[in-house]
Amino acid sequence: MNNAIFPNKFKAALAAQQVQIGCWSALASPITTEVLGLAGFDWLVLDGEHAPNDVSTLIPQLMALKGSASAPVVRVPTNEPVIIKRMLDIGFYNFLIPFVETQEEAARAVASTRYPPEGIRGVSVSHRANMFGTVPDYFAQSNKNITIIVQIESQLGVDNVDAIAATEGVDGIFVGPSDLAAALGHLGNASHPDVQQTIQHIFARAKAHGKPCGILAPVEADARRYLEWGATFVAVGSDLGAFRASTQKLADTFKK
């Protein structure tokens, strides 16, 4: 196949447990995304859950990353087959599925990205992902080149981490530290020992099933600790956070 998307290098890197350093994109801006794509990150999350993103804003961001070595990962707003199908059709191959609590929910996410008989993805013969029908073996290659990362961020998800990690087709486990902290009774305090112990437990159980773990860690000390604990893919910051910090610093330099 003469298509740079296949094979999926990010999926292969996760399977090989190669450390992948990423960044979170929440500004919903093609220009910002293009700048991130030039920075040298291994992967970038384009957030469709908490950021103001939808199909119309994500397509220009995918275009902005064309030619970048950074793998685009979309966090969908919910584990819903129609939403996932639309993200597939516009050209995403790497998915972060929020708030997965059971093996059944994990399996549903996988099925949503696979064509029958392996899954339930609807079939369109011409869309952006298959270069509008010009990729002859897209149907044969697509199923095995999709990355599914499921996000554990509740007590029920923690309780079911073994079953979730063992789900066929799940490529990785991602910890949502803020929601996990809230679920454990420590809203706004992901550094609480209970939360940190739970994160370490999730990492250990995922590793026991041979699945790589990831997390968002905008504080350097946290990111380095999670890497020491065995995290494979870590988002070490965000465009929003970097922009706010740098502009605040600039203003403070001259205003104070």
Curated annotation (Swiss-Prot):
> Could you tell me one molecular function GO term of this UniProt entry?
2-dehydro-3-deoxyglucarate aldolase activity
EC category: lyase
Which UniProt keywords are present, listed alphabetically?
A: Lyase, Magnesium, Metal-binding
Query: What's one Pfam family here?
Result: HpcH_HpaI
Q: What is its EC number?
A: 4.1.2.20
Judging by the UniProt lineage, the source's domain of life is Bacteria
Cofactor annotation remark? Binds 1 Mg(2+) ion per subunit.
What does it catalyze? 5-dehydro-4-deoxy-D-glucarate = 2-hydroxy-3-oxopropanoate + pyruvate; 2-dehydro-3-deoxy-D-glucarate = 2-hydroxy-3-oxopropanoate + pyruvate
Q: Where is this site: Transition state stabilizer?
A: 75
Q: Where does substrate bind?
A: 151, 178-179
Per the Swiss-Prot or TrEMBL record, the active site comprises 50 (proton acceptor)
SUPFAM superfamilies annotated for this entry? Phosphoenolpyruvate/pyruvate domain
Involved pathway(s): Carbohydrate acid metabolism; galactarate degradation; D-glycerate from galactarate: step 2/3
* Task of the protein: Catalyzes the reversible retro-aldol cleavage of both 5-keto-4-deoxy-D-glucarate and 2-keto-3-deoxy-D-glucarate to pyruvate and tartronic semialdehyde.
Question: Which protein are we looking at?
Answer: 5-keto-4-deoxy-D-glucarate aldolase
Q: What is the source species?
A: Salmonella paratyphi A (strain ATCC 9150 / SARB42)
